[in-house]
Amino acid sequence: MRLWKSMAWGILLWHSQSGALCPAWPPARAAEEIARLQQQLADWNDIYWKQGVSAVDDSVYDQLSARLVQWQRCVGQDVSSTPVSPPLNGTTMHPVAHTGVRKLADRQAVEQWMRGRSELWVQPKVDGVAVTLVYQNGKLARAISRGNGLQGEDWTPKIRLIPSIPQTTQGALANAVLQGEIFLQREGHIQQRMGGMNARSKVAGMLMRQDNASALNSLGIFIWAWPDGPANMPERLSQLAKAGFSLTKKYSLAVKNASEVERARQSWLTSALPFVTDGVVIRMAKEPASQHWRPGQGDWLAAWKYPPVAQVAQVSAIQFSVGKSGKITVVASLVPVILDDKRVQRVNIGSVKRWEAWDIAPGDQILVSLAGQGIPRLDEVVWRSRERSKPVPPDSHFNSLTCFYASETCQEQFISRLVWLGSRSALGLDGMGEASWRALHQTHRFEHIFSWLALTSAQIANTPGFAKGKSEQIWRQFNLARRQPFTRWIMAMDIPLTQAALQASGDRSWEQLLMRTEQHWRQLPATGERRAGRVIDWRDNPQIKTLSRWLAAQHIPGFGS
């Protein structure tokens, strides 16, 4: 299928500002779009933390939050109001602030961050809900949600119902503050294959609801910080393990360079783990005294997240393609995103009817993943732009019997037919892709799909963009095509039969084909009444008849008398 480029419709120009892609919106529209997305995120955030219900996938929420920050920076707007953390409903102060963790984009960023730092350890970045555990006199005294990092909600009653969280401690941990992640316990969770499973939202939901005490049995705890704990990391891990926080020791590895971090990251991505993860955290063994911890200022640790299985992508244009059979397909052009090291800048939406049902317009944010063989796939529309400017699709009069001859309205189906006849399923013209066919047709103005047979070597050589070697190769391919058997030419003319059925018919000339009845076609493999009728319609089509006579004049095998 080829792009109906004259019908392509784009709305956004993009420019770079501080390394980020910015939409070229008028100020009024930028303010409106930012306000709408900000409000939507705030609504989702409120539902998530107050009701324990996720109205949107965790990854989608995170990516749209990042998109909002990007837009705010593009227009020089303060990003402090971005709703990426829980609403501050709780008033319980944390004994030690939650610093959060800086995100590193790639291995190069990891190398830069590690440079000059020593005694480094890597841990899986467990995906759940952050909590502070306060032990006093050997007993769990308080449990506080992360909140804004300085204060949160008192979760003590719920946390005491989670069997995996020790209720008593001894020794140095008898009076201690711990920070960690409450997670959904999994058996043999392979992150690469199973994904995030919206684990964070599920945990939040269990902690928010009042009627599900039994569900808390499925929660676990991963301690990632012991403020003012033992300075020696192995000693710290050993004491945590003895106290019942064994996962921290099991999943903490000393690392010296980015290669070791990358190796651990890949291993945890592909191995069976007892929890969902979304990357790794690298941390220094030596930490500042707890009184110096502040939200957003934890420069002794950093995260290297896994690339998302699906990416939120901005639709930059809607285009239509018309295949050789006349089928119109809608394609969304995207501001490029990276999925599994693949640059994705377009995704097939499907038919016009499906596109209309999806209600996708330029400016919308869609979720894209990779299906089998790395083909981009549209998963859902996660955010719609206020402006709904959509292109008008081409007329739907195209079908399997149109555009054997070139015309202004037939350009795309005509090109699709040329691409088809040059494919290995037809004449096998090596090196003849869409770009080559477009160049030849644009220069020499083909009358019909076989007009290229009349080109001279000089005409091909004079085609703009064709080097000498390429033009000579095309000339050879065109001459070799003349020797192809009759059945290959019939396939090039898009007879509605499979190659197996055509071979079974035994026809080796146009004259034989004209003598066949509908009953004959019905008896061929994979050819029923409907397909047999289509063969008759194809054979009797005036354009097909004219092409057969033209091929006869060119002395193509099977078409002459």
UniProtKB/Swiss-Prot annotation:
Gene name in the database record: ligB
Enzyme class: ligase
Function text: Catalyzes the formation of phosphodiester linkages between 5'-phosphoryl and 3'-hydroxyl groups in double-stranded DNA using NAD as a coenzyme and as the energy source for the reaction.
The protein's name: DNA ligase B
This enzyme's EC code(s): 6.5.1.2
InterPro entries, sorted: DNA_ligase_AS (IPR018239), DNA_ligase_B (IPR020923), DNA_ligase_CS (IPR033136), DNAligase_adenylation (IPR013839), DNAligase_N (IPR013840), NA-bd_OB-fold (IPR012340), NAD_dep_DNA_ligaseB (IPR050326), NAD_DNA_ligase_OB (IPR004150)
Signal peptide: none
Alphabetized NCBIfam families for the sequence: PRK08097.1
Location of the active site: 125 (n6-amp-lysine intermediate)
GO MF assignments: DNA ligase (NAD+) activity
Protein's UniProt keywords contain ATP-binding: no
Record-level GO BP terms: DNA repair; DNA replication
UniProt catalytic activity: NAD(+) + (deoxyribonucleotide)n-3'-hydroxyl + 5'-phospho-(deoxyribonucleotide)m = (deoxyribonucleotide)n+m + AMP + beta-nicotinamide D-nucleotide
